[in-house]
Amino acid sequence: MAKLTPFAWIAAVAAGILSLAGHQVSAAAVDGSELPFPPVPSASKAGPTLQTSVHHRRAQPNHLAKDAPNVLIILIDDVGYGQASTYGGEINTPNLTRIAQSGISYNAFHNTSICSPTRAALLTGRNHQRVGSGTIAERAVDWDGYTGVIPKTSATVAEVLKNYGYKTAAFGKWHNTPADQTTAMGPFDKWPNGYGFEYFYGFLAGETSQWEPRLAENTSIIEPPNTPGYHLTEDLADHAIGWLKKHQSYTPDKPFFIYFATGGAHGPHHVAPAWTAKYKGKFDDGYEAMRERIIKRQKESGWVPQATELTRRVESMPAWDSIPASERPFQLRLMETFAGFVEHTDAQVGRVIDELERTGKRDNTIIMYIFGDNGASAEGQRGSISELLAQNNIPNTVDQQITALNKLGGLD
């Protein structure tokens, strides 16, 4: 079996957890260089007969103190931190705010511009190309650094914590397996269960429908629930809460590690109309005026330096004043739908945190709420009613936009 070699941040997390727990361990144990731990030798001795044999049930080693903290990593997809009300934005994120107000906020999270590399680096603590993730999993090729497969010699944080006795689970987006290896036949060692997660519920792709997702549970492809009003992000929160309840019932003495990675707010932007309606009229003066408001608030709050200047509008984004009046309702509805989707996503995160509070576990849980894996959603530009149309550079006609106006965000 290959030795697991976690890199700096994972080793630091493990060391910090052990330190917080008041547990004294050797340097080798802290850095994880000898994981998995060697098996405990048996104290039993078999003699010629039962009477001359000695049986002692071996005690399982405890590598953690009783009060070792739980760990919850929350990763939101395709958002920029400047969009959150927490940091001066226009989208309500009360649950991000309550975590920020009770902890420490960082505004220099260094990531890559696409999903898979950022996630591979986050999970392993290594440069994304060092772990085969130089591009998104769907574009994996057999070149060093671009295979789309995290090598087994590079431990994920889940593997490290699992070896120390943590219960581990992942919910939501898993974008670190090449597309041709996500079928019902595996190979399953490239799925989350093969990277230290004892339980997985989510999807194996960069995106999926929130209404009719392609779901996987552990190593099985499953059908989504046929429930009226079903929404994937709500389902992920339901499963995370259910898992926490099982943990509380069966293994309350063991700490847990949860990786909660939502599909929101990556396209397609799917959310119930009630959430979209909350932003009706909020952006009527256009996105350029919105940017000015956000940067002003961020400077006032100290989130960005006073000398910060807005980036220039990219040429592919038309100036708001240049958009014909007949097209503006469509553009505004796109913005309102996205905003509703983001707030809805934050609300589901809040439900998971509520469960930690209900069971009295929040105070002993390290929560890392990462608001954006690679910056804001790039599905903007002129907007589209169909991703396939956008990918083929086929613009929507005004008639198509008007017809689709009240369908945006919905199943149709």
PLM feature segments, named:
Residues 2, 17-18, 22-412:
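Formylglycine-dependent sulfatase
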Residues 1-11:
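Bacterial N-terminal signal peptides that target proteins for export
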